[in-house]
UniProtKB/Swiss-Prot annotation:
GO terms for cellular component: cytoplasm. Keywords: Cell cycle, Cell division, Cell shape, Cell wall biogenesis/degradation, Cytoplasm, Peptidoglycan synthesis, Pyruvate, Transferase. It holds the Pfam family EPSP_synthase. Its main location: cytoplasm. One of its GO terms (molecular function) is UDP-N-acetylglucosamine 1-carboxyvinyltransferase activity. Phosphoenolpyruvate binds at residues 22-23. It is found in: Cytoplasm. Cell wall formation. Adds enolpyruvyl to UDP-N-acetylglucosamine. This is UDP-N-acetylglucosamine 1-carboxyvinyltransferase. The lineage of its organism: Bacteria, Pseudomonadati, Pseudomonadota, Betaproteobacteria, Burkholderiales.
């Protein structure tokens, strides 16, 4: 099993490319199921979840051609994927392909909308709380779908005599990104108008909507909490570039800040990271949009002030940045309180940070109080390298950030979590001067 060996203490300096967003690429791959015409996606990241999704749709009978440099030393090689679902023969997502990736549920809406039936295994792939799919099911039922859950599968079909879903006004009980995406895709081929209330406003949802519009969909209000979709009879193919990954960009912002570096994040979108950037600036980090990306300069963590925050839905502070910013707080000055409101069980990185010397106390798995090490000694206290174990995707990133500033060697085990969401992370960090390598 692969591990990352990190020798800390080097500032990150230079330029780093930000890849396409996993959370946009996955639904956009599923959007190709909505049409019989070819679809071409650019800037598709090289990630385990993307590879799993491609295997899933290929298993359905979709022709998939991928042009990507498999060499992770070429960290800026944007991937191109061409998909042709014209001969799709099996509208089914079996458990053996779905079990490692929750996003496979995104195939449900497109398959049902285009073929009138779909069989999708209940998803797996994430250890963070329950993340129920009931909002997907309720929304599709409101559009006329008949759905039963049995033997671990969601079996969906249109009522006898119906050839299309019907438009509906749908208000989800909670803000759900994948739920919004699934219902958005299904609604593009429904009869009449669909209104999604309490819709997710994330940039990845808006980017999916932009792709669907290129395919001929009629959508208004994406990027707001109310999305209107006027269904059409068919969609056509398109070319689309996946939006830059704001969470990868935020992760590198925290890594550069923690190490006292100076870097340009090429392709990064500052306007998608307002909540994170505001906290970094409050901490003492210089962050500014620059032509072609985001510039970040830091005096070093020991001179930064720890920042409290509360995770909320976009445009608030993203839950997917909680662990990385906590790692920065660990080595900054002062005390900060972090409240996690989106998912349960999302402090699993805390025990591993404690192994490196962090000072963190948690309450009920929802609130963490971090006593920064930056003010603990005249020269600033230090983390000390150790062997740590990744427990989920963003926890992995927080341990890497901590390892970059720790004294000595840090060994991060179970980095398959990292490979699910970061495109060639160690190659990009080496390009900024980090001493990091992948070992067996």
């Amino acid at each position: 099993m692969d591990k990352l060996l990190i020798r800390g203490g080097r500032p990150l300096v230079g330029e780093v490319p930000i890849s396409g967003a996993k959370n946009a690429a996955l639904p956009e791959l599923c959007a190709a199921l909505l049409t019989a015409d070819p679809v071409t996606l650019h800037n598709v990241p090289r990630l385990q979840d993307v590879a799993t999704m491609l295997r899933l749709i290929r298993n359905m009978g979709v022709q998939v051609d991928r042009i990507a440099n498999p060499d992770c030393s070429v960290a800026d090689a944007a991937g191109i994927v061409r998909l042709d679902a014209g001969a799709l023969s099996t509208p089914e997502a079996p458990y053996d392909l779905v079990k490692t990736m929750r996003a496979s549920v995104l195939a449900l809406g497109p398959l049902l909308a285009r073929f009138g039936e779909a069989t999708v295994s209940l998803p797996g792939g994430c250890a963070i709380g329950s993340r129920p799919v009931d909002q997907h099911i309720k929304g599709l039922q409101a559009m006329g779908a008949q759905i039963v859950v049995e033997h671990g599968y969601m079996i969906a079909r249109l009522p006898q005599g119906c050839t299309r879903l019907r438009g509906a006004r749908i208000t989800t009980d909670m803000v759900t990104v994948t739920g919004t995406e699934n219902l958005l895709m299904a609604a593009t081929l429904a009869e009449g108008e669909t209104v999604l209330e309490n819709a997710a406003q994330e940039p990845e949802v808006a980017d999916l909507a932009e792709m669907l519009i290129k395919m001929g969909a009629r959508i208004e209000g994406h990027g707001t909490s109310r999305i209107r979709i006027q269904g059409v009879e068919r969609l056509h193919g398109c070319e689309h570039a996946v939006v830059a990954d704001r969470i990868e960009a935020g992760t590198f912002l925290c890594a550069v800040a923690a190490t006292g570096g100076d870097a340009l994040l090429r392709h990064g979108r500052a306007d998608h990271l307002d909540a994170v950037i505001d906290k970094l600036r409050d901490a003492g980090v210089q962050v500014a949009p620059e032509e072609g990306g985001i510039r970040v300069r830091s005096p070093g963590a020991a001179q930064l002030k720890a920042q409290g925050f509360r995770t909320t839905e976009y445009p608030g502070f993203p839950t997917d940045m909680q662990a990385q910013f906590m790692a920065l707080n660990v080595v900054a000055q002062g005390t900060a309180t972090v409240a996690e409101t989106i998912f349960e069980n999302r402090f699993m990185h805390v025990n591993e940070l404690l192994r490196l010397g962090a000072k963190i106390q948690t309450t009920d798995g929802r609130v963490a109080v971090i006593e920064g090490l930056g003010g603990a000694a005249p020269a600033g206290a230090r983390l000390s390298g150790a062997t740590v174990m990744a427990t989920d995707l963003r926890a992995s990133a927080s341990l890497v950030i901590a390892g970059l500033v720790a004294d000595g060697e840090t060994l991060v085990d179970r980095i398959y979590h990292l490979d699910r969401g970061y495109d060639c992370m160690e190659a990009k960090l080496r390009g900024l001067g980090a001493d990091i390598e992948r070992i067996q």
